[in-house]
Swiss-Prot record:
A Pfam family annotated for this UniProt entry: HbpS-like
SUPFAM superfamilies: GlcG-like
Organism listed in the record: Yersinia pseudotuberculosis serotype O:3 (strain YPIII)
Signal peptide: none
Protein name: UPF0303 protein YPK_1581
Coiled coil location: none
Matching InterPro entries: PduO/GlcC-like (IPR005624), PduO/GlcC-like_sf (IPR038084), YBR137W-like (IPR010371)
Matching PANTHER family: PTHR28255, UPF0303 PROTEIN YBR137W
Family: Belongs to the UPF0303 family.
């Protein structure tokens, strides 16, 4: 899958993975679902769900460390800045051959355009926050969020195209 294809999929994901409503109880249910999926996949994650700058769910699985919390913060900041997934932001920067600090003047100590943060979007209302994970390779973090969000909103298994590592464009 090349860069253009991945960007197109990221746009589709953000359009399709929208919720009807979201509250504190929803955050708890979603956070628990992420934890269970991580356990099934044998990966230790730090998990954070933030709405309007308030943390509604936070959990650090055994095997994570403070560094994972920092990655959560940095990825979440990208979603808040650009209103797109942290993975899609990284792809857009690659496409434009630039970086977060060069394009937006932000510190890379505070922002990371790597997979693992996804906007929480309410249908017909917009983005209210983000769901964020850290602990696996960043593409795996991103795909885990896609899988869980799709299942959480009741989309059929396999209806969301998971992303694969980038392949160069053929000449």
């Amino acid at each position: 899958m090349n860069l253009q294809q991945q960007l197109a999929y990221c746009q589709q994901h953000q359009q399709r993975l929208q919720l009807r409503h979201f509250d504190n109880e929803t955050a708890w249910q979603l956070g628990e679902k992420i934890k269970r999926q991580a356990e099934k996949q044998g990966v230790a994650l730090a998990i954070d769900i933030t709405v309007n700058h308030q943390t509604l769910f936070s959990y650090a699985m055994a095997g994570t460390c403070a560094e994972n919390q920092d990655w959560l913060r940095r990825k979440r900041n990208v979603v808040e800045l650009l209103s797109t997934s942290s993975y899609a932001a990284g792809l857009m920067l690659q496409q434009r051959e630039t970086s977060l600090d060069a394009r937006y003047g932000v510190s890379l100590r505070d922002y990371a355009a790597l997979g693992g943060a996804f906007p929480l979007q309410i249908k017909q209302a917009g983005i209210i926050g983000s769901v964020n994970v850290s602990g696996a390779p960043h593409l795996d973090d991103h795909n885990l969020l896609l899988q869980v969000l799709a299942d959480f909103i009741g989309l059929p298994i396999g209806s969301i195209e998971l992303l694969t590592p980038l392949t160069p464009l053929s000449a």
